[in-house]
């Protein structure tokens, strides 16, 4: 898979895949070795009693980590392998314990108490990130006014679903059709990545996705695009989307014209070749009916400069998951966008264009932890209202050079 190998984030994902296939017993030496190493460091710095206490604490939290991670598939919370996140947590815990031992030379009690608190906090965050936050669905509402819309009957409401990453249906997925129906939207759009990469040919995952999409019976106008080519197997997903009555926009546009709105929805298939994808976007913008508000559906936010230069009114994307793990005051730790944190999540203005990057609903695959931290799953509702004023600016037929 060329793209996966070229993107550092996905290179990391590939590296996590192999440990997910290791037998659980093969993991035992690492926490034992780290507990012994940290125990020796504390014994050397503060005495044998502190060393035994540290080694015992690390073994206890390692057992708790494994109990938590291995229980996730049985509880129906998520369905990824436990081995890679367990190894990562064990390594982090060992590093913290050894680092804390360096402070123990000036007095052991306070550093050990702080170290123990951090170790327990990691367990709490792991439980919260895997069992709680992935199910705290947030409905984000955005209001945009445009002189291209009259809206005598009220705003045009669009609901966006992105990055479902289905492995097996969870309680979040089962609640989704009812949540969408309650939003009373005019148009629903899906912006790619329907199955998790490691499940994208799995018969049960495909059947579960079909059940989920079939349940999304409203609104009547439903459109979808493809996500990353390595994730979305179009040959397997096309029949599922079509059976659910969802219209695929594969490098084409569709015009919706009523007495309430005049909309040109463009779907660009994501190849992660920015120059080629931008050229197909230019063609679709050139085909836009005069006076129509243009809505671009593209899986990643990476065409934002081109879309703004071409005068696209609204651009809905996903792909980044908002980072999936965020730090307060900093935001996404890492994103899979070529622009890094520039378009990590949320609403952006580029000239007269609006971009919204959804945090998505699902989580990364391979051996990555099926966890969200300070980055709740998101359903996006955009209300497009008319605005009196100057005539809208004409659209350019040429974006920036790729």
What are these model-derived regions, one by one?
Residues 1-137, 390-402:
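Non-catalytic terminal accessory segments
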Residues 107-118, 122-183:
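N-terminal signal-anchor transmembrane helix
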């Amino acid at each position: 898979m060329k793209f996966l190998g070229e993107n550092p984030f996905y290179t990391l994902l590939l590296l996590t895949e192999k440990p997910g296939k290791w037998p659980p017993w093969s993991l035992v030496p690492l926490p034992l070795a780290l507990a012994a190493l940290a125990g020796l460091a504390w014994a050397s710095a503060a005495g044998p009693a502190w060393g035994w206490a540290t080694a015992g604490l690390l073994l206890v939290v390692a057992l708790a980590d494994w109990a938590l991670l291995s229980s996730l598939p049985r509880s129906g919370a998520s369905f990824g392998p436990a081995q890679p996140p367990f190894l990562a947590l064990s390594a982090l815990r060992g590093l913290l314990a050894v680092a804390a031992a360096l402070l123990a030379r000036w007095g052991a009690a306070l550093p050990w108490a702080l170290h123990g608190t951090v170790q327990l906090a990691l367990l709490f965050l792991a439980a919260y990130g895997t069992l709680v936050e992935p199910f705290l669905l947030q409905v984000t509402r955005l209001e945009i006014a445009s002189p291209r819309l009259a809206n005598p009957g009220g705003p045009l409401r669009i609901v966006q679903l992105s990055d479902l990453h289905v492995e097996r249906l969870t309680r979040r997925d089962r609640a989704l059709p009812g949540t969408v129906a309650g939003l009373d939207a005019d148009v629903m759009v899906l912006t790619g990545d329907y199955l998790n990469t490691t499940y994208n040919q799995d018969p049960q995952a495909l059947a579960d996705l079909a059940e989920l999409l079939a349940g999304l019976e409203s609104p009547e106008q439903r459109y979808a695009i493809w996500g990353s080519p390595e994730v979305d197997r179009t040959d397997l997903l096309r029949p599922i989307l079509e059976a659910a009555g969802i219209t695929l926009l594969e490098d084409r546009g569709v015009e919706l014209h009523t007495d309430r709105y005049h909309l040109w929805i463009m779907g660009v298939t994501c190849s992660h070749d920015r120059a080629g994808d931008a050229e197909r976007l230019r063609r679709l913008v050139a085909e836009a009916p005069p006076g129509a508000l243009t809505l671009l559906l593209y899986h990643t936010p990476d065409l934002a400069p081109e879309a703004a230069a071409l005068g696209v009114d609204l651009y809905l994307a996903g792909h980044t998951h908002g980072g999936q793990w965020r730090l307060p005051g900093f935001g996404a730790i890492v994103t899979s966008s070529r622009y890094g944190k520039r378009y990590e999540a949320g609403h952006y203005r580029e000239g007269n264009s609006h971009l919204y990057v959804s945090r998505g609903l699902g989580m990364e695959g391979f051996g990555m932890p099926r966890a969200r931290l300070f980055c709740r799953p998101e359903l996006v509702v955009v209300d497009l209202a008319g605005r009196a004023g100057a005539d809208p600016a004409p659209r350019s037929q040429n974006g920036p050079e790729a």
